[in-house]
UniProtKB/Swiss-Prot annotation:
This is Nonsense-mediated mRNA decay factor EBS1. Disruption phenotype: Results in stabilization of NMD targets. Residues 760-772 have a biased composition (Low complexity). It is found in: Nucleus; Chromosome, Telomere; Cytoplasm, P-body. The lineage of its organism: Eukaryota, Fungi, Dikarya, Ascomycota, Saccharomycotina.
Amino acid sequence: MEPSNTQKEDLPTAFNGIKSQLNSILKSNQLFQDYALLNGFLAFVHSKLNAAILTSIESQCGKSFAADLDSFDQSSISSILDFSWESVHYPIFKWFQMWRNYILFEKENKKQQTKFIDFRKMNSKMLKFFKTVQNFYVNVINTVYKKYDISVLLPKRIIQDLKLSDIENTTNVGDILAVKTFNSSSPLAHLIPTLFHRCLLFLGTAYRYKTLLEEISNKYSISNFKKSLDFFRLASLVLPSAGETYSQAGAIFLQTGNLGIAVFNFVKGMMTKMPSPVSIKNFGALMVDNKSSLNRSLHTTIMNTYLQESKGPRTPAKEILEFYFLGLFGSVWSPTSWRDDTKPNQLNNGIKLRHLENALYETMSARYLNNIKTIFHNLIITIGGFHLLLKRRSDVSAKTLKDLRSNELDYLNFAFKYIAHILNDIVKESWSENPEVSEILGMVRIINCWIKANPMVLQYSQSNLEFVNALAYLINDIVKKKPSPSFSITEHIPKRTYWFEEDLMVKGLSFVNFQLSDFDDYEKILEMDHSLDRLIGNPPLCDKLSASSEMLLRLQAVVNISSQLLQNNNCGVEWSDNKSRYIFNKKIGFKETVKNSMKTSKQSNEKAKLQRKNKPSTTNGSISMADLERQMRSSSLDSFSPTMGYSGSSVPMAPDTFNVKPSGTITGNKVNVELLKIELSGQNADGAITNISPGYSNAAISSSNSTDESSFDLNNILSSMQQKHAEKSFAKSMQGVNEQIPANDVCHQAQRPMQGGLYSSQQPSSMSSLNSAYQNASMPPSASMVSYPYPFLNQQGQGVFPPYNAQNLQWQSEAYSLKSMNFANPTWLGDQYQTSAPSSAYAQAQRQMFQQPMQQDVGKYMQFPFDAQSNTDSMRGNSRNNMF
């Protein structure tokens, strides 16, 4: 049934009426004592919204078999779900947040015992509200599942996880809600994933608020948010192209101090088909805006890790891999925010970049197995960071190396150095011994597919000596160990019956053209039974392969793509059919010989010192000529110190045979001898040195010398899919990332200003004492405003909000955020409070705000202070009341 134009026009009117009613309820004081008013309002609203959703779906059923997908309107259903969260549930959660903060703040301000009674009252009402929200979204899912047979649109794993199979047969045959079946080619099929994704996303966010509100302490761990992360995981499987899911997951990891995986999720949130503006702002607050509390705290955390590393004896491996990497990444991605203006080779906090680099790569090579996921996340950040740099450009037309700027080439140098260490220190050393660790070869698959999908990256990789060497050595090692009797390098693209975990990790990300392309199996999998489950890595048990079998498939894909990437390299690495391995030019020989010769010379010097130390003492400091001659003759002719004819002589003794070495041996300088064997064959030695020891300020190659199109044949390996993900709107957002401020809520659409009653400047009497608590406290600079459906949520600002368990003196020094709050209508963000600057980045008071020790020394090593205002708030805005 198609709704009339009047019905369509009534929807915005109904929305405005609902917002006006909720505005009146929250403005009153009744909610503190009586929950019945809100409960009745929610029952009415949920009934209306449920009916509107079902009506909208029914109105589209007639179009479900239409050939023109553009004629199918799913915006009305999405707008209803968005309205339910943004204009109804979210403001109420924010109201409970302010109530909780008032209770905790009053406790700290008056130095009274914890007000468990008031907190219990608040928590009881909040839990009732949460259950109402949970039931609403679950009922939407259940109703749609009962009314329509959508088994062809959703994986069975998701149906089982949501326990939908329990209600599968509850619909009567003669019921008006008879089951209707449609296939995956129906336009309506595009609506179901969107509807389920919205519901799962909002359920996960509601659980996150529940976790934040029900704890009397602001200390949280990942385990506290398990339910939320489970829903976000399901939402990403249903609709991987939506960046909001990763933004919300990143907010949780930000709240719990897991900065590496938080940035990882923010990068994913920016690289999807539907980028999240919240991810852009949070990424900017962490990595770009050095005036934000998050960026300052990250600098302090890196310093704490450095102090802990210096103290010893235990090396904080996870902290080094996580925080040192972020420091290096920031110093290359946004040098002006991270590097010292006068000393560009060190961070703002004084730590030298070379130390961070050495410690990071040394830890990677020695402690990778226990931290493989962190290294994997860093790889995604590294790859995504390059494309984020391109999106910051005013023009998005860069196609070749000649179009790149110096900072972008420097970033590629950093990225490929990190990749080369992964290939050399992790993959080559451990792939054969750890088949159960899928991340080892999974990283190589992502690296190869990223290079394959991006022509300018391919151009750079083929001239990057360190990367070409590392990839060739890895392929040689795989071929040499021959993981199976039939294993070989072929042009045949392998096939699978289901996707692997790394496929899901980058599914929907633009830098790999939205899926990995080293297997030719997508169409084949779609024709199989349980195809949707296979595409989320959950095949039937009969088709599930062992870890070793999966490793063989990954190896075949890695070898095939790698051999194509190495075909047109400019580093002289060539495949030898006779030797069945890659051989290296003299430049590689020069590099390896110098290293080996220096090592041999050092060992020889140490051996000579040891011989002198162990030399037997002589009687009275003398030795007979006969004994001396005997010792000289018995010494080896291969010694680096040549045998002399007699004591004091500088002439070597005559050799016993004519089997002698070149004259270089006479001087004992083995390095020179080895260098004589080298033929440079016209290679540029300067270029070799540049690639042997690249620095941050240098590109690995000169772009002007590496962009000869005739040297690259991309047709054999480039993906046929063109990159269309650099939308101008997103590029514009990235251009201003330096000016972005932290924000933690997903903005589905711009909210129109609410029509109707506004809050008046009144306050519940129970909170009136708070007005004068900090009347003269300073406020941070104003932030760009985000319009909310209710005025009391439109108060925004940026600054540090200390944890509630901080010391009273420290708390009061930072309590500007709670001064003169009006919790029913807080209008305390005036111009007179927007003039003070943020506190010093490394002030002692700021460091003391950290809650938990990273290690044993409580006084020195402190955990990241994810303040209450923080960039972890959910789903809308950057309010000063966003206490989480």
